[in-house]
Structures are given as structure tokens and as C-alpha cells.
Amino acid sequence: MLNDLKLSLQYILPKLWLTRLAGWGASKRAGWLTKLVIDLFVKYYKVDMKEAQKPDTAAYRTFNDFFVRPLRDDVRPLNTDPNVLVMPADGVISQLGAIEDDKILQAKGHDYSLEALLAGNYQMAGLFRNGSFATTYLSPRDYHRVHMPCNGILREMIYVPGDLFSVNHLTAQNVPNLFARNERVICLFDTEFGPMAQILVGATIVGSIETVWSGTVTPPREGIIKRWTWPAGDSEGSVALLKGQEMGRFKLGSTVINLFAPGQVKLVDSLQSLSVTKIGQPLATAVEASTAAEPAPLPEEEIRAEHRASPLVDDTQDQG
């Protein structure tokens, strides 16, 4: 009954209005009140401020400044093996695995359409049919900048307007085509591992999605699909990003989806739904790589804190 009510509210609540309100509040300078809100947020979500370049919460003029806080250079070591693709974000794995023709796993027993995720772009979808994917959810406690899994040349960016459903265990199980319905920014790269898409997906109260080459992509929310292209390789005007380099950020929320071409990479065997991710740790390896790569083990306390903060964890079950 309670879950039915929560799900109904996802359809009834004015999500766009709530998102605009949250974005407005998060951008305001409110002095002691801003610091109080940040302090309460840090305490509730157990945010590790020792990792931040500015660990003192008084250093942040707005909540948005705090939310996109940069980390110290030494806290996310980058796996430099050229055969290894690294995790693009801190968070937890929602799902990962094989793309079965046009089907991507959303939750156990629930798939969504690759082509729909890519806004009906059948040519782009053709690059990734029968490839592989990884979906990473960023909880409120996480660092909210998104980085490159490997070196890449940006070729295309598509802004897709859409719904702003929350991303959690309940919606993943019950909202069909959740990630193909929500607002998103699709970024297509040429890489040494073939084409790669990195998709930034919005949700309720995600105030904005930004990229390092275009700045703020949304808002404004104009309700139309927008597309930009860039030249290949060393051409004038091309955009090249290095493995581990920041490529975008969220101001509140949400989810990153990576798509890889068939026969190019192998996802790390130990990764599964609810695995905790840290930027720079192994996500996948080149198929011809002779050695396997594994993420560094994390303290149990960190894993528990991440799971407590993640709405992907089914809170109707005992998580231990």
C-alpha cells in the first residue's frame, strides 16, 4: 500500500516545479543558513569532507558549490593501465552487463530499449547493439562530477527532454523505460575501444546537468531535442578528453550510463548490482588484455554508508 502511494506520487507531483525550486534554493547565498543546511546534510549522509579540497563547510557560499565540491588530487588514484577503462563516477552500480540486441536491463525482470534511450537514433543504437553497458547511480553523499573511463574524442552531444522521475529501487521496478523517459544528455565519443556513449540522466530535483565543453546544458528546459556535433581527431575545433579527466557534473542527482560497442571491452567480473564505485578504479578491460583488473577493496564502513544513502537498495529488506 505504501509503495503504491509512493509510486502514484511520482506521477502526480509537479516534478518540474520541484526541480526548479530545488535548483533555485541550492544556488542562493544564505550565509549561516547555507552552512547549517550543508552541515546537516554532511551529518545525515555521512559525507567524508576530508576528501574535499575544502573540508570546511563554511568555505561554500551556496549548496550547489558544496554539491559539486572538487576532491583532493590524491583521493581517487587512477588506474593507468592502457587496457583498463575506469569507473566514471562515485556511487553504486545499478545494473551492468550485456546489451541483448535492443534490450538493456533496468532492474531484475525489467528491460528498456537502447534505441529509446538514444532518443530514437537508430544509427547510434546500431553502434551498441549486443555490446555492453554499466549504469552507475550517484547518491546524495557522493562526489557529483563525472569523469572519462578512457581517452576519447567527443563526436556528438544530444540533449533529450523528458520526465524527472526519481531513480530508486521502487521506480526501477515499476516505471517502464525509466532511463529512456527521464531528461538526459547523451555524449558520444570515439575511443581506442571503439565508440563509447556516456549518458548523464536527470531526475527529480536535479537542478542542472553540465559538461566541461558546453557549460550548463539544462536548464533551460525548452522541451525539444537538441544536437551538437564535433570533428574527429586532430581537426580544428575537436574536443579531446583524457582518461580520468572530468567531463561533466550534476547539481543534485543522478545516474550515469555507459554504452560500449560489441567485442571491444569486458566488464570486470566482480562487479554486480550494488557494487560501490570509485572514480579511477577498473570498470572494464580491453577484450585482448592478458591480465584481469579488479577494483581496490573498500572498507566495510564505506560500503555500508554508500548503501544506506542509495535509494537503489530495497529498504523493505534487511540489508545487514
UniProtKB/Swiss-Prot annotation:
Assembly and oligomerization: Heterodimer of a large membrane-associated beta subunit and a small pyruvoyl-containing alpha subunit.
Name listed for the protein in its UniProt record: Phosphatidylserine decarboxylase proenzyme
Site (Cleavage (non-hydrolytic)): 253-254
Disordered: annotated segments: 288-320
UniProt KW Lipid biosynthesis keyword: yes
One GO MF term attached to the UniProt entry: phosphatidylserine decarboxylase activity
Lineage: Bacteria, Pseudomonadati, Pseudomonadota, Gammaproteobacteria, Enterobacterales
Localization: Cell membrane
Cofactor: pyruvate
Coiled-coil region: none
Domain of life: Bacteria
InterPro entries, per database record: PS_Dcarbxylase, PSD-B, PSD_type1_pro
Pyruvic acid (Ser): residues carrying this PTM: 254
Pathway: Phospholipid metabolism; phosphatidylethanolamine biosynthesis; phosphatidylethanolamine from CDP-diacylglycerol: step 2/2
Catalytic activity line of the entry: a 1,2-diacyl-sn-glycero-3-phospho-L-serine + H(+) = a 1,2-diacyl-sn-glycero-3-phosphoethanolamine + CO2
Keywords, ordered alphabetically: Cell membrane, Decarboxylase, Lipid biosynthesis, Lipid metabolism, Lyase, Membrane, Phospholipid biosynthesis, Phospholipid metabolism, Pyruvate, Zymogen
Species for this entry: Klebsiella pneumoniae (strain 342)
EC number, as in UniProt: 4.1.1.65
GO terms under cellular component: plasma membrane
